[in-house]
Amino acid sequence: MSKLFNSLALLLIVLSFASCQEKKAEANVPKWILSMVSDSKNTSAEADFSNILSDKSVPYIGYIGTDYQKFSIDIQKVQRTDDNQYNVSGITVVKNNRCNFRGTIDIVENREFTHPTYGVDDSMKGQFKRRGCSIAKYNLEEETSQTGSGVFTGYLLFYWYENNDGKFVYDDIDSHSDSYCNNQYAGTWKSNKTKKSKLCAWGQYRVPNSGDLDIGAGEFSVNPKYAKNGWEK
């Protein structure tokens, strides 16, 4: 009887610890991400996400600063270095200033959606094992020798699905949806020269944590009051 009691006590301790760890992890994740993963649970995903992180199906849309100055980024290379870390490199552009950057993306959590949808007319039903997303931290350092360089830090959320062959694929199942987005980055940029920080975010189709910048219903559309900040065509 005492062995059974001890086993139950140990199980409760383990479950309590796991619950505390999950709550602690969630406490560090930005609210904008938590709101997008509410219908999901922790999962394991032994996969190389390089193909998703380097996706170029559409260019990134981004901003920097409280005036929502247009920010462009081209992620040119992504290479997995261990189970949860990726080396990345590319180019950023703000106004006429270009910088090269290198850095890392570290996956902190993989999640599986508990009530996945199946696309238009359920066309993807039976075509995948599960749909999910990954939460990651990023640290991207622009070359210090270049004018206007700095360091980007923040969180990233990207979506995937595992097909019936066990391959993890860029999730565009809901691309017909007005709110569809993928590869969402949001955080800050800190100037190497002044050490001052600015908000900075970018993503595919939509931009996370962007206040009233995007007023589009069916697709991204810039608020006219910010058009002069690099958004005019």
Label every PLM stretch briefly.
Residues 76-78, 104-108:
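Short beta-strand micro-motifs enriched in acidic
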